[in-house]
């Protein structure tokens, strides 16, 4: 039996940011390597400031790595970030959800913005809501979710 195709390959990813107040740089992501198989569920867990959001933004093609190579669905993220953005989405809880809209309304808004066909939304929403354990909160305003 062969292994499932790889959805993500990260090879020795590094990212630094300049701290304006000090003029020094700080390491946000240091030497991260991983492979995620298609169809698998993977979680990034770590304390505040560990680089989780930075790594996700690089994977989604919203930010470039300083070093290393990222490949998403066979696409070199550095070479063609728009192709990655056309295939995947990144929606953070903070600054990504409209707090006055319900969870369902936020899903519909982002699906509209990314051109997700109506025919596949129901199945996709069900999977996302199950993965995030938010199915029972679809009518709740995003600003009233725990952690919001």
Feature map (PLM): residue ranges:
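ABC nucleotide-binding domain signature
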Residues: 43, 88-92, 108
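The feature captures the beta-strand-to-loop junction immediately N-terminal to the Walker
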Residues: 45-47
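Helix-to-loop junction immediately C-terminal to a conserved catalytic motif
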Residues: 60
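Conserved ABC transporter NBD signature motif
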Residues: 68-79, 83-84
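Conserved ABC ATPase "signature" region
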Residues: 108, 112, 119-137
């Amino acid at each position: 039996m062969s292994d499932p195709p790889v959805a993500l390959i990260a090879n020795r990813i590094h990212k630094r940011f300049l701290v304006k107040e000090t003029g020094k740089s700080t390491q946000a992501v240091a030497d991260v390597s991983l492979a995620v198989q298609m169809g698998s569920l993977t979680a990034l867990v770590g304390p505040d400031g560990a680089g989780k959001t930075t790594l996700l933004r690089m994977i989604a093609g919203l930010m470039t790595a300083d070093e290393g190579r990222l490949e998403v669905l066979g696409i070199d993220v550095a070479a063609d970030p728009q192709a990655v953005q056309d295939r995947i989405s990144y929606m953070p809880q903070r600054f990504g959800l409209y707090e006055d809209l319900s969870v369902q309304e936020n899903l519909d808004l982002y699906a509209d913005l990314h051109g997700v066909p109506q025919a596949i939304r129901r199945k996709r929403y069900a999977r996302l809501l199950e993965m995030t354990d938010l199915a029972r909160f679809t009518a709740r305003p995003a600003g009233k979710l725990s952690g919001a």
